[in-house]
A protein has these predicted regions:
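Generic alpha-helix initiation/capping and coil-helix boundary signal
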Residues: 8, 12, 16, 33, ...
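N-terminal cationic amphipathic segment used for targeting or macromolecule association
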Residues: 44, 50-53, 57, 61, ...
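Formylglycine-dependent sulfatase
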Residues: 73, 80-91, 95-499
Length: 499
């Protein structure tokens, strides 16, 4: 069968836009499509180590120079010609739900913000912050040692999680910083939410959205700029037309961007803000410490408490679980809990202040751990546990001030054992904790050193739900279910891109 006519999950699609500069480097950068036999098995051999490439700084390295845990001081080589190359990665054949005689499971994805590999005790024995709930999740499921975020900053990673594709494919770089639109997810783009809705799931997102949405002014003109003045122009009686409800989610409660950082300090419920902001945020009473900077002087709504944002998000997720149990317990659900913790400023809730011996940021990490524990506890209490896959990860590595200050004051390294932090191409910027739990399906206490990326969640959910991904969706997503269910050692991917 001609390569381009092979089924989506039986091929690796490579899309190139070659320039003269790339052509000069063909001898150093020859990529061949993968071929499959009649059983659609991957006809490739496991490599001793994997490669991690930057979208803007990319070329294969000799096998002997690939990164491993002992390569922390070796930089990614400065590579040529990547900006003109788009590489499509598709999911490879995997164990199906039917083969394992499984009903469609509920899926819960908990995404921390700026939580480093070394911030979690089960990844870092020298961590100064206790994370008993995340550690327990690892003991009850599978811990991945080589998981990566598709980007080293918030917005591109979230776009990739929601779409299963790299954000550079739509020309996006950087971070969405305000209330201006439009949504960065294209209108007709298949998302993880819309895919699961098509498969009969109830879908919900609670927390930060951070991939853009459009407000309108009183004249009905869309607000497309960020900053204080555009926020002042918003007509809050008009609905949002390109938010989570229009990108695959039945329920949404959260914020447009970082709830304690950006210009609009107000909650969105569904497609509008029920309690609009009325004044400039007063930062005078906010905590003062090395981790307290980073919030802009935006507009704030009455009752919006910057120190209790994550507890509000947690309560909304718990209310969703309880309501689903009462109204439609036999219908599968997808819950995406998108936390603010532990993004700067480090404003742990009042119940968590001085909960650790690692300062306010340590307390914030402890609050994130509490959130994980509270959600898992509620899922189990409601009887959802055995048929729910819980995934936990972070959108990128730890922030620069947190790493620098925590190293000095508490001998805690949130990037340990990797070099680099958030925004870096170094391993510490994109290697993230990733844990999966599914009782009686995923072996408790197991560990995988497979190289995976957060883009892989969508293809995995497609297999779990019985969805068939079209060729123009989730191009960079690989199904990791064979590793989760069967602990397959067959390599999921040859390399990982990040931007």
């Amino acid at each position: 069968m001609p390569f381009m006519q092979q089924p989506r999950h039986d091929r690796l699609r490579l899309t190139k836009r070659l320039t003269k500069r790339e052509s000069r480097h063909q001898q150093h950068m020859e990529i061949q499509p993968l071929h499959y036999n009649q059983q659609t098995e991957r006809n490739c051999q496991a490599k001793p180590r994997r490669q991690v490439f930057s979208v803007f700084n990319f070329t294969p390295r000799p096998a002997q120079s690939r990164l491993c845990p002992t390569d922390m001081k070796l930089p990614h080589q400065k590579l040529v010609g990547l900006a003109a190359m788009l590489i499509g990665l598709s999911a490879w054949p995997s164990a199906t739900i039917a083969e394992h005689h499984l009903a469609k499971p509920n899926i819960v994805f908990i995404l921390a913000d700026d939580l480093g590999y070394g911030d979690v005790a089960c990844y870092n024995p020298e961590s100064k912050v206790p994370t008993p709930n995340i550690d327990r999740l690892a003991k009850e499921g599978m811990l991945f040692t080589d998981a990566h975020s598709p980007s080293t900053v918030c917005t591109p990673t979230r776009y990739s999680v929601l779409t299963g594709r790299m954000a550079f494919r739509n020309g996006m770089r950087g971070v969405f910083t305000g209330a201006g639109g439009p949504c960065l997810i294209e209108k007709d783009r298949l998302t993880i939410g819309s895919m699961l809705k098509q498969q009969g799931y109830t879908t919900a997102l609670y927390g930060k959205w951070h991939v853009g949405l459009t407000f309108f002014d009183k004249g009905g003109k869309p607000i497309l700029k960020n900053g204080l003045e555009p926020v002042k122009q918003i007509d809050y009686s008009r609905p949002i037309t390109d938010g989570p409800l229009h990108r695959g989610f039945d329920h949404f409660f959260g914020t447009a961007c970082c709830p304690t950082t950006d210009w609009l300090y107000a909650y969105i419920d569904g497609d509008r803000i029920p309690v609009p902001p009325t004044k400039i945020v007063d930062r005078t009473p906010l905590p003062k410490h090395p981790y307290s900077r980073d919030n802009r002087p935006g507009m704030i709504a009455p009752g919006f408490d910057l120190e209790e944002v994550d507890m509000v998000f947690l309560q909304k997720s718990i209310e969703f679980l309880e309501a689903h149990k009462k109204k439609s317990p036999d219908k599968p659900f997808f819950l995406f809990h998108s936390a603010q913790a532990v993004h700067l400023p480090s404003f742990p809730g009042r119940a968590f202040k001085n909960a650790t011996n690692a300062g306010p940021h340590g307390d914030f990490i402890f609050e994130m751990d509490f959130i994980v524990g509270a959600l898992v506890k509620k899922i189990d209490e409601l009887g959802f546990g055995e048929n729910t896959m819980i995934l936990f990860s972070s959108d990128n590595g730890p922030e620069v001030p947190t790493v620098n200050n925590m190293r000095k004051t508490h001998n805690h390294d949130g990037a340990r054992p990797w070099r680099g932090v958030k925004r870096d191409q170094w391993e510490g910027g994109h290697r993230v904790p990733f844990i999966a739990r599914w009782p009686k399906k995923i072996e408790a206490g197991s560990t995988s050193n497979q190289t995976i990326c957060l883009t892989d969640i969508m293809a995995t959910c497609a297999t779990l739900s019985g969805a068939k991904l079209p060729d123009n969706a989730a191009e960079d997503s690989f199904d990791i279910l064979p590793t989760l269910l069967d602990q397959s050692t067959k390599p999921i991917r040859e390399f990982t891109l990040h931007q």
